[in-house]
Amino acid sequence: MAEKTQKSVKIAPGAVVCVESEIRGDVTIGPRTVIHPKARIIAEAGPIVIGEGNLIEEQALIINAYPDNITPDTEDPEPKPMIIGTNNVFEVGCYSQAMKMGDNNVIESKAYVGRNVILTSGCIIGACCNLNTFEVIPENTVIYGADCLRRVQTERPQPQTLQLDLLMKILPNYHHLKKTMKGSSTPVKN
């Protein structure tokens, strides 16, 4: 069983994925994406496509799970892909079920983003914020504080290119990495 699930993980050249991370199901990881040890990416209700230049930190959980009212044994639900854009940051211990996410978003530590939330681009979900509504979060929205207050920032968060470069250099020195795909077939950017 473990053999079969590992076969469907596609890692583009240039991505850094630590062996200690847990990746299950049909997952495609784009170039220049860094996945820390102990990060978990689980595709059980459909594939997960992760774009270019994303940073997924320790104990972050990205899961494409079945909705609570559907059990895969009794019904045969249509698999729905989870699409994650470019230059997103998933900080330590965050939980994301968002089925569609644009570019340059930050989900901070211990934040929770539910399945029915669509993040556009440039959004920041603050530490410990719980977002489980049926809505599309407008561009450049910041959600913060215990009451999940909202405001709009004037520009998008900067991509973490320097941090990604450093991690791509440092992580291979201290952790074993999962093998990338051969050839030049990289995932398509949405």
From Swiss-Prot:
PTM note: Phosphorylation at Thr-186 by CDK1 during mitotic prometaphase creates a binding site for PLK1 that facilitates its recruitment to kinetochores.
Transferase keyword on record: no
Gene Ontology cellular-component terms listed: cytoplasm; dynactin complex; kinetochore
Keywords for this protein: Centromere, Chromosome, Cytoplasm, Cytoskeleton, Kinetochore, Phosphoprotein
Keyword Phosphoprotein: yes
Alphabetical list of InterPro entries matching this protein: DCTN6, Trimer_LpxA-like_sf
Entry-annotated residues carrying Phosphothreonine: T186
GO biological process, one term: mitotic spindle organization
MF-aspect GO terms: dynein complex binding
Localization per record: Cytoplasm, Cytoskeleton; Chromosome, Centromere, Kinetochore
Main subcellular localisation: cytoplasm
Family of this protein: Belongs to the dynactin subunits 5/6 family. Dynactin subunit 6 subfamily.
Role summary: Part of the dynactin complex that activates the molecular motor dynein for ultra-processive transport along microtubules.
Subunit-level organization: Subunit of dynactin, a multiprotein complex part of a tripartite complex with dynein and a adapter, such as BICDL1, BICD2 or HOOK3. The dynactin complex is built around ACTR1A/ACTB filament and consists of an actin-related filament composed of a shoulder domain, a pointed end and a barbed end. Its length is defined by its flexible shoulder domain. The soulder is composed of 2 DCTN1 subunits, 4 DCTN2 and 2 DCTN3. The 4 DCNT2 (via N-terminus) bind the ACTR1A filament and act as molecular rulers to determine the length. The pointed end is important for binding dynein-dynactin cargo adapters.
Protein name per its UniProtKB record: Dynactin subunit 6
